[in-house]
Amino acid sequence: MKLVLVSTRGVRSLNSTNFPAPWPFVKKGAFGQRKIGPMNYEKFKWPGQNREFPELSPKFQKLNPKELHRYTGVQADGFHDEKTGEFVPVKEMRSELVVPNLDGFKLRPYVSYRTDVQIEKRRVAYEKKVLEKGSERLADLHTVEDERWPPPKMSAETLFELAYGDTVRSAYKEGKYGNK
């Protein structure tokens, strides 16, 4: 085996180790997908190298400015006094929510009239199904969930019916749950 002396001073020479192939060729000892072409490794990607973070983050850089020691990305509601070194809160800089008083406001949020028609259709159809089958439980078994109104509340029994109801009923009819 031939050892190659490579400069450690950061100087590039015409040594072949400084000029790797643009992609790994399929050969003995290749790893990953055995193909010819460029390969991207996630382990070599560091956060911030391609400007993923717009803020200057001391986490991924060697410089660690004092201004960013307790940086949270939140606008401060005051300033640091350089003479005393203390934080001075300013009332005008404090963020506040401005919510209008809607007491006595006549308008309501807009909902399309077509929605009301669809809801009414679903309610009437479901009530007919309840009258036809005799109870809400039987009507629920014979109604698609999207056609029910009001929509069903999910209970343990409903979940069991949706997941195992048909198989348990068919197994019971076949006599698999009898005394043996």
Curated annotation (Swiss-Prot):
Residues 1-21 form a transit peptide. Keywords: Mitochondrion, Ribonucleoprotein, Ribosomal protein, Transit peptide. It is found in: Mitochondrion. InterPro entries: Ribosomal_mL41. One of its GO terms (cellular component) is mitochondrial large ribosomal subunit. GO terms for molecular function: structural constituent of ribosome. The keyword Transferase does not apply. One of its GO terms (biological process) is translation. Belongs to the mitochondrion-specific ribosomal protein mL41 family. Component of the mitochondrial ribosome large subunit (39S) which comprises a 16S rRNA and about 50 distinct proteins. This is Large ribosomal subunit protein mL41. It comes from Caenorhabditis elegans.
